[in-house]
Amino acid sequence: MEMKPKYDPREVEAGRYEEWVKNGYFKPSEDKSKETYTIVIPPPNVTGKLHLGHAWDTTLQDIITRMKRMQGYDTLYLPGMDHAGIATQAKVEAKLNEKGITRYDLGREKFLEQAWDWKEEYASFIRAQWAKLGLGLDYSRERFTLDEGLSKAVKKVFVDLYNKGIIYRGERIINWDPKARTALSDIEVIHEDVQGAFYHFKYPYADGEGFIEIATTRPETMLGDTAIVVNPNDERYKDVIGKTVILPIVGRELPILADEYVDIDFGSGAMKVTPAHDLNDFEIGQRHQLENIIVMDENGKMNDKAGKYEGMDRFDCRKQLVEDLKEQDLVIKIEDHVHSVGHSERSGAVVEPYLSTQWFVRMEDLAKRSLDNQKTDDRIDFYPQRFEHTFNQWMENIRDWTISRQLWWGHQIPAWYHKETGEIYVGEEAPTDIENWQQDEDVLDTWFSSALWPFSTLGWPDLESEDFKRYYPTNALVTGYDIIFFWVARMIFQGLEFTDRRPFNDVLLHGLVRAEDGRKMSKSLGNGVDPMDVIDEYGADSLRYFLATGSSPGHDLRYSTEKVESVWNFINKIWNGARFSLMNIGEDFKVEDIDLSGNLSLADKWILTRLNETIATVTDLSDKYEFGEVGRALYNFIWDDFCDWYIEMSKIPMNGNDEEQKQITRSVLSYTLDNIMRMLHPFMPFVTEKIWQSLPHEGDTIVKASWPEVRESLIFEESKQTMQQLVEIIKSVRQSRVEVNTPLSKEIPILIQAKDKEIETTLSQNKDYLIKFCNPSTLNISTDVEIPEKAMTSVVIAGKVVLPLEGLIDMDKEISRLEKELAKLQSELDRVDKKLSNENFVSKAPEKVINEEKRKKQDYQEKYDGVKARIEQLKA
């Protein structure tokens, strides 16, 4: 298959994905003897198109599953999408509002038709984006959280938890969105710092003897106050506990109670208790059996309990109430105060802590089981490990979970109320005498259904489902650290509760994609980046490699066009290296193993050794999900070792007359390039398929090719030392040429004073490389080379590299250069000495590491002595 002179991602990627899908390459293996590897995609919301965070998330998943497929696993990467209750409903309502229509105008059934239309439209966008990213998904198993099968799972879980007493209906403080008129989960509340005020009021004692000072940021809620609390250890208030105060405006008597929740050092040390409008106040109210007085309605307007403020918006009420208190001389002071205020992620409304009758999941036992499971062999491994502490901490302090939502789009709660008796019936099927019952109109929190995602997508609750039996539990979950609480934790406790097993073995957590300046990407800042635009410009492979290798697990990623472009340059380098290799391999070249009986050159042995080292490194790091380090290892090997050195060195035999040596070089080129493509494939699926198809190969696609394996027979340790010596000499000569302004095209005499006879022999045997890369007019390699008085000398591991300078150099400049080199070597010696004199390092570091530092010291000392001697020689 022909490779064009220039890498064009559009040409390379066009039609490739469709071919993979059509040929069924992403379907699980029919060989059931294989070990399985499963990842279920974190389902994107059908609210819109995918962003860079989704691209990062799914790229990591695809890399893992492609690699596991190549390693011989029966691999399933299962796609799906989330109905995203409030988020999607808000989008659909906004679209209707543009036409002057509300959901109530349409009614529930017609509105849901509109929502399903929205889902179908955006699901097709998402699939197209998955395709452009090259995700190896098995579309025959695609799931949606409102699918019939998943709905069945949701109903079963709800009913089972209700029958166990874990799900209950009750009154609690929830996050209330007065604009969308629904309860919200914590993740749907965005906290923002807002400029507000601290209002300090007088609450007069009922006996007329003075007042107690109370501070609040929400004066409108004081209309629902039912007590004042102070800390029992606060000496200031010991004598007033048990007394009463008069609630301003309302006139209701409030008891002063003792509760250790109160912070003695905060404010006046006394706080008002409004159980119906604050979570902490509600819990205090429960302890002291206080009345719950709700003073607002579901629209955020004051109700009949607010007296003369009835019908006012809550914020208008705040202003008027403060003015009224000023008139009564009950305002002590008003302080400017910046505080965190929750806003609805969807509507933008200020969220109201609100006492409401909702459905809840009792979390104590579920959380305990999740924590206990982490102490067993069935534990889940977190990457990075520090996030296990985050998970444990949340589970230890968990509150009951509000699962009902006042929406239409979602799983309607499978509970019915008898029209006459009020009896509650909960079941997977509706009551037989349905005419006597009214179903609960609320739907379940989106996270309730997505918490079942790892097993509901595989056929559960049908325990005989082939997919469930074969592919559950899944192997890895890849997701952002920002949803450990809201999704990861819930999948864990639901998986344990309903399957008695962890839902996944590993959790790989990544951070957020940020703008280059570190700020969060957002529409309001206008700094968002559409991944599809990046793909159109640079190709999917460039974006994927950047996303995968640009960060380490658990850390945020800063998007950089410059870095994506540098990956594009890297792919161009690979492309050009592949074209050279293919042109020299020839069309008729057959797939052959490396002939170890043949005369492998130093370059051949070295590149094969470095290849095997890279295979080992990449495999090991990938198993630890250290893809940033994988990227560095691949880049260094491909760019430096293969393209810059081996390809150039291979031109020596390829331009020579030794046909046997040419054939060996072709074999090594082909073998190395083939293995490079296999290692790169999970990261860059498109360009590697294109190049691999052009190489001599077996099989239909690189997707199904085997992962490279380390071959001990192709590791030649001694080649590394020799190559290191040659490369250092070549770099030294080139650097010296630059310093004396002598181009590489100009032949100059070069002398190499070898450190010993063994090195002299080795360098002489490999002088062809020195001739090619250094372009000498004469090359003299010997242990007893005489160094001319006027010469440029570089001290290297192998000895000294000497360029006679007669007519080439200014002596004063050369002395200055050597003195700078001497200072640099002294700095390195000081660094190594400091390390080796550090008792902590010497006692803890492996012996191999310590010996390496000692070797470095010896090398630096030898270089230092040589440079110093040369300076003295020139000065003499």
From Swiss-Prot:
Entry EC number(s): 6.1.1.9
Pfam families named in the record: Anticodon_1, tRNA-synt_1, Val_tRNA-synt_C
Disulfide partners: none
GO molecular function: aminoacyl-tRNA deacylase activity; ATP binding; valine-tRNA ligase activity
Binding-site positions, ATP: 523
Motif ('KMSKS' region): 520-524
Subcellular locations according to the entry: Cytoplasm
GO cellular component: cytosol
Annotated InterPro entries: aa-tRNA-synth_I_CS, aa-tRNA-synth_Ia, Anticodon_Ia_Val, M/V/L/I-tRNA-synth_anticd-bd, Rossmann-like_a/b/a_fold, tRNA-bd_arm, tRNAsynth_Ia_anticodon-bd, Val-tRNA_synth_C_sf
Catalytic activity of the protein: tRNA(Val) + L-valine + ATP = L-valyl-tRNA(Val) + AMP + diphosphate
Example GO BP: valyl-tRNA aminoacylation
Motif ('HIGH' region): 44-54
Coiled-coil residue windows: 805-876
Keywords: Aminoacyl-tRNA synthetase, ATP-binding, Coiled coil, Cytoplasm, Ligase, Nucleotide-binding, Protein biosynthesis
Gene3D superfamilies: HUPs (3.40.50.620), Isoleucyl-tRNA Synthetase, Domain 1 (1.10.730.10), Valyl-tRNA synthetase, C-terminal domain (1.10.287.380), Valyl/Leucyl/Isoleucyl-tRNA synthetase, editing domain (3.90.740.10)
Domain notes: ValRS has two distinct active sites: one for aminoacylation and one for editing. The misactivated threonine is translocated from the active site to the editing site.
Assigned protein family: Belongs to the class-I aminoacyl-tRNA synthetase family. ValS type 1 subfamily.
Primary role: Catalyzes the attachment of valine to tRNA(Val). As ValRS can inadvertently accommodate and process structurally similar amino acids such as threonine, to avoid such errors, it has a 'posttransfer' editing activity that hydrolyzes mischarged Thr-tRNA(Val) in a tRNA-dependent manner.
Subunit record text: Monomer.
Protein name: Valine--tRNA ligase
